[in-house]
């Protein structure tokens, strides 16, 4: 006579649910703060970035965290540098 057994396997560990999930960092609000053709005041932030996605052109400074800012008041102009590089410049009005 053969016996038929049904075995139910249970999880040896709890499902890694609510205690291990639920963390996320706040967004860093990167990107363009002023567009092409807009007027910038001296010291205003033009572009926030991580690394040099866009390079500084005329009258534009590069901050310690690679933020681009206007050195003088003027009009913003996004331009192409040699190759595939992009730069942003500020021209006086």
From Swiss-Prot:
Modifications the protein undergoes after translation, according to the UniProt entry: The N-terminus is cleaved by ribosomal processing cysteine protease Prp.
KW Ribosomal protein (keyword) present: yes
Alphabetized InterPro entries for the sequence: Ribosomal_bL27 (IPR001684), Ribosomal_bL27_CS (IPR018261)
Gene3D superfamilies from the UniProt entry: 2.40.50.100
Record keywords, A-Z: Ribonucleoprotein, Ribosomal protein
Propeptide residues, chain positions: 1-10
Annotated GO CC locations: cytosolic large ribosomal subunit
Molecular function per GO: structural constituent of ribosome
Recorded superkingdom: Bacteria
GO BP term, example: translation
NCBIfam families: L27
Family assignment from sequence similarity: Belongs to the bacterial ribosomal protein bL27 family.
PANTHER family according to UniProt: LARGE RIBOSOMAL SUBUNIT PROTEIN BL27M, RIBOSOMAL PROTEIN L27
Name of the molecule in the record: Large ribosomal subunit protein bL27
Native source organism of the sequence: Phytoplasma australiense
Gene: rpmA
């Amino acid at each position: 006579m053969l016996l038929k057994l049904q075995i139910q396997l249970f999880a040896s560990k709890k499902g890694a649910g609510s205690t291990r999930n639920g963390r996320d960092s706040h967004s860093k609000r990167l990107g363009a703060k002023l567009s092409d053709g807009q007027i910038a005041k001296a010291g205003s932030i033009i572009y926030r970035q991580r690394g040099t996605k866009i390079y500084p052109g005329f009258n534009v400074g590069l901050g310690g965290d690679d933020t681009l800012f206007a050195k003088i008041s003027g009009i913003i102009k996004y331009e192409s540098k040699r190759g595939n590089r992009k730069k942003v410049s500020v021209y006086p009005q």
